[in-house]
C-alpha cells in the first residue's frame, strides 16, 4: 500500500511583507508558547498569538488578516517581554491591522475595527485608556446603542 504525499510550495511574500512592516524577524519563532501563555486576551482570540506567527510563516494571509486576533490585541507588550527571541508581537499585530485595512479584508466580528479605533483615540487623548469615553466613542461610531442592554 502506497501513500501519496503532496507537497505544496509556500508563498513567502506574506512573511516577507509582515517582517518588513513590523521590523520583526518571525523566522526566529520556535513555538515555545510563552507569548500565548502570557497574553491576557488570548482566550478571546480565534487564533492565538503563536499560531498567528506560524500561519504567517505558512503564507496564510487571508486567514490571518481576517482574524479577530489582530484586532483583540491590546498591545500590552506582555508577549514581547516573555519571548526568548524578543519578537514583539504587539508591533506585528499593528502591522497586520494596517495590512487588513489596506487590503479591505473584514474582521469576523462586526464593528471590531471601530472598537479598536475608539481604543486608540482614547489613548491619544489622555495617554492611557479611559474606559467610559472609549465606550461612548465606540457606541457613537457603531450606532449600536442597545444590543448589550437587551437580555
Model-derived regions, located:
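Ferredoxin-type iron-sulfur electron-transfer modules in oxidoreductases and energy-metabolism complexes
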Residues: 4-21, 44-70, 89-137
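Intrinsic disorder at enzyme termini
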Residues: 134-151
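Cysteine-centered iron-sulfur cluster-binding motifs in ferredoxin-type domains/subunits
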Residues: 25-42, 68-87
Amino acid at each position: 500500500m502506497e501513500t501519496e504525499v503532496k507537497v505544496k510550495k509556500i508563498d513567502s511574500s506574506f512573511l516577507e511583507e509582515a517582517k518588513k512592516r513590523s521590523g520583526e524577524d518571525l523566522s526566529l519563532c520556535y513555538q515555545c508558547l510563552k507569548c500565548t501563555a502570557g497574553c491576557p486576551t488570548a482566550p478571546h482570540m480565534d487564533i492565538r498569538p503563536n499560531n498567528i506567527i506560524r500561519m504567517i510563516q505558512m503564507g496564510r494571509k487571508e486567514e490571518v488578516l481576517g482574524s479577530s486576533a489582530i484586532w483583540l490585541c491590546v498591545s500590552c507588550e506582555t508577549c514581547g517581554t516573555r519571548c526568548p527571541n524578543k519578537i514583539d508581537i504587539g508591533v506585528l499585530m499593528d502591522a497586520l491591522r494596517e495590512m487588513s485595512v489596506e487590503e479591505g479584508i473584514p474582521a469576523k466580528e462586526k464593528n471590531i475595527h471601530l472598537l479598536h479605533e475608539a481604543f486608540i483615540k482614547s489613548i491619544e487623548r489622555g495617554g492611557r485608556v479611559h474606559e467610559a469615553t472609549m465606550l461612548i466613542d465606540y457606541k457613537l461610531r457603531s450606532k449600536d446603542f442597545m444590543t448589550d442592554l437587551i437580555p
